[in-house]
């Protein structure tokens, strides 16, 4: 029987926001995996434990959910006036691919902490006490993100009293600024790729829906909960235990992706699970969060439920929160209308685990909506650091 020895790679397992992922420094990866391509993807798949037909990722670091099947590669930035280049890979659980089409807003909260602790931020920029401003170049979406990381006695402060719904224990607050979050790249173009703040989306054998398509933080399709037969108060099990509902959402997402210009044919959606996201909104209602916490309609401006990688998210994706804040700031979008309409610079929304506040500054310039930045607070913590091992013939 042949035997292939395992290799070990320096890695850090971190929580960022309501997600967890395996973090690497680019130059710690095996040489073949230091460049984009098949070797890198195969390595990350093996690290996380995919593809797994059992859907459990038992033989890897993944947690068998969209929030925990994630990888991050960081390097000293090659961009002027930036500290760190941040590349995010969303690893499919049951299929053999890594989706590089978008960012993870939750893990963004951990990028600054990792960069400081691993020598990617110049030492003269790190205060003895206070906030360290880490300038992040997000390579997937070619955008600048600023993380304000608390420092105590020259070290990253991870513990604190900041509470984040969806995370059990309090931690230190990390404020994140997503600068110019609207997509202006080759895929999707403007913030509103169709040129409209509300469109009609026709989905064969499903129905016709009002939709807001937006490229901000991450490409997102917003629908009205009532049009789908929902209240907006649903928790994970209500949606994720309904295979018919999940298939319907995926079909709507595929047709929406075509209308947004992200793919040319609905058949391409299966290999692009990370983007676009699909979410549904409703006016405030009383509900009980997954933790048992009561959320009153007076606590929030609107309710939002979002799907990631084919399942309802347990809380809210960080990038989708940017999309929510941006859409809420622009009068007439479905998100804005669910929040009561009008102009606003911040919104607090209810999600399955509780509530979240996100701010965005929008203005109309030459008949085009422009958002200068979106702001939200998360937290981050190192869970484990050392080496991750994979069979030497994995890639």
Where are these regions (language model features)?
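A glycine-rich beta-to-alpha transition motif near the start of alpha/beta enzyme domains, typified by
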Residues: 1-395
């Amino acid at each position: 029987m042949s035997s292939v020895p395992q290799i070990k790679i320096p890695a850090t397992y971190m929580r960022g926001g309501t997600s967890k992922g395996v973090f690497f420094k680019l130059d710690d990866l095996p040489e073949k995996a230091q460049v984009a391509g098949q070797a890198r993807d195969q390595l990350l798949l093996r690290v996380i434990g995919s593809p797994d037909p059992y859907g459990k990722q038992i033989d890897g670091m993944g947690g068998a959910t969209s929030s925990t099947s994630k990888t991050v590669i960081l390097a000293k930035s090659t961009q002027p006036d930036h500290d760190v280049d941040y590349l995010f890979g969303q690893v499919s659980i049951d299929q053999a691919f890594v989706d590089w089409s978008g960012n993870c807003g939750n893990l963004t909260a951990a990028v600054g902490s990792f960069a400081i602790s691993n020598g990617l931020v110049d030492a003269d920029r790190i205060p003895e006490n206070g906030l360290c401003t880490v300038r992040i170049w997000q390579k997937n979406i070619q955008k600048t993100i600023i993380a304000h990381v608390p420092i105590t006695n020259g070290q990253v402060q991870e513990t604190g009293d900041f509470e984040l719904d969806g995370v059990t224990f309090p931690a230190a607050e990390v404020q994140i600024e997503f600068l110019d979050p609207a997509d202006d790249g080759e895929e999707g173009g403007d913030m509103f790729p169709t040129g409209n703040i509300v469109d009609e989306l026709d989905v064969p054998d499903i129905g016709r829906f009002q939709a807001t398509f937006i490229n901000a933080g991450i490409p997102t399709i917003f629908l009205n909960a009532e049009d789908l037969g929902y209240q907006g108060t649903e928790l994970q099990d209500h949606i994720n235990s309904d295979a018919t509902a999940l298939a319907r959402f995926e079909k709507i997402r595929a047709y929406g992706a075509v209308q947004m210009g992200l793919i040319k044919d609905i058949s391409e959606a299966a290999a692009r699970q990370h983007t676009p996201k699909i979410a549904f909104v409703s006016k405030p209602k009383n509900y009980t969060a997954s933790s048992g916490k009561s959320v009153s309609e007076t606590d929030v401006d609107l309710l939002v439920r979002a799907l990631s990688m084919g399942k309802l998210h347990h809380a809210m994706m960080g990038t989708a929160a940017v999309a929510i804040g941006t859409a809420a700031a622009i009068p007439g979008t479905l998100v804005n209308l669910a929040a009561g309409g009008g102009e606003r610079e911040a919104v607090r929304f209810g999600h399955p685990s509780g509530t979240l506040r996100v701010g965005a500054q929008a203005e109309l310039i030459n008949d085009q909506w422009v958002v200068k930045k979106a702001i939200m607070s998360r937290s981050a913590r190192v869970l484990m650091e050392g080496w991750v091992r994979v069979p030497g013939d994995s890639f």
